[in-house]
UniProtKB/Swiss-Prot annotation:
This is tRNA dimethylallyltransferase. The record marks S99, R121 as: Interaction with substrate tRNA. ATP binds at G9, P10, T11, A12, S13, G14, K15, S16. Keywords: ATP-binding, Magnesium, Nucleotide-binding, Transferase, tRNA processing. GO terms for biological process: tRNA modification. It catalyses: adenosine(37) in tRNA + dimethylallyl diphosphate = N(6)-dimethylallyladenosine(37) in tRNA + diphosphate. Monomer. Belongs to the IPP transferase family. It is an enzyme of class 2 (transferase). Its cofactor is Mg(2+). The lineage of its organism: Bacteria, Pseudomonadati, Pseudomonadota, Alphaproteobacteria, Rickettsiales.
Length: 305
């Protein structure tokens, strides 16, 4: 039986660099599991190095237009296809990224809830944009008391709950009970690159400086030209909100960098918590890139024997 390897970890921990080294040594296939690195035309703000977009060993990087509607369900179907293609070619597959919802769907599966029509999705986005998260949450709570389980700051979960109720008249939580999850792959090994926070923070800070000194501002200008809704997934990429504030003249560029660094450190903190609590008990946590490379090369070599 094939074994699927999943490499995850907080932002800026070095997952892409590890995957590049392992791919070069073993010729394996790398499949993206970062919900922002799927997007085209914005490589700087999504931290897509050129090899991620051009090397045929790397899949699901930079292939979705920023204005296109895309979901975890669509990603999971794309990922399953890429994984099976790799195995058909006798290539080990490693899924790499830090997006919790994508990782969870791959490990535990998704409930088969009916998709919402496009006009209902539009209606939900327009309402959220008009009233904001708090009011949207309260409106939804009146329809479905179980919505109290959702973090009102999580726009994606609020929108999905609204869409499901509006489309079917049934709570998304009831659908999940009716349609239990089915694991896409039974044989998964999860590896977590988990550096100490005090080592990660300087890397986050320097990454944001490098982004701004590169083409991040131009990429955000491009996104603004598309007139995307504020809650579009790509508009939540690291640094986008802060650069928009700079471009609108509300803050200086150094203030935008400082705010992006602070917000990214807070995001990494949430990732640390999620990774500790939501992954299988046998997930392998390692603190350094070197240890992770050695571990993956060893495990992949053993598995392929």
């Amino acid at each position: 039986m094939h074994k699927l390897f999943i490499l995850t970890g907080p932002t800026a921990s070095g997952k892409s660099e590890v995957s590049k080294i392992v791919a070069e040594r073993l010729g394996c296939t790398i499949i993206n599991c970062d919900s922002k690195q799927i997007y085209q035309h914005v490589p700087t703000i999504t931290d897509q190095a050129e090899y991620l977009r051009t090397n045929p060993q790397f899949g699901l990087y930079g292939y979705v237009h920023p204005s296109n509607s895309y979901s975890v369900g669509l990603w999971l179907e794309d990922a399953k296809r890429e994984i099976l293609l790799a195995w058909e070619k006798k290539s080990p597959a490693i899924v790499v990224g830090g997006s919790g919802l994508y990782i969870s769907s791959l490990i535990y599966g998704l409930s088969e809830i009916p998709p919402a029509d496009a006009h209902i999705r539009q209606k939900a986005r327009a309402l959220l944009s008009e009233v904001g998260n708090d009011t949207f949450f309260e409106l939804l709570l009146r329809r479905d008391a179980n919505v109290c389980k959702i973090d009102r700051r999580n726009s994606n979960q609020l929108l999905r709950a609204f869409e499901v109720f509006e489309s079917t008249g049934v709570s998304i939580f009831s659908w999940r009970e009716r349609c239990p999850k089915k694991r896409p792959f039974e044989n998964c090994e999860v590896c977590v690159l988990f550096p100490p926070k005090e080592e990660l923070h300087p890397k986050i800070n320097s990454r944001l400086v490098d982004m701004i000194n590169s083409s991040a501002v131009a990429e955000v200008e491009y996104l603004m030209s598309l007139n995307l809704p504020a809650d579009a997934p790509i508009m939540k990429a690291i640094g986008v909100r802060e650069v928009i504030e700079y471009l609108r003249g509300n803050i200086s560029l150094p203030e935008a960098v400082e705010a992006a660094q602070r917000n990214t450190r807070q995001y990494a903190k949430r990732q640390y918590t999620w990774l500790r609590r939501q992954l299988p008990q046998d997930a392998q946590f390692l603190p350094t890139r070197e240890e992770m490379v050695q571990h993956l090369v060893s495990r992949l070599t053993e598995t392929e024997k």
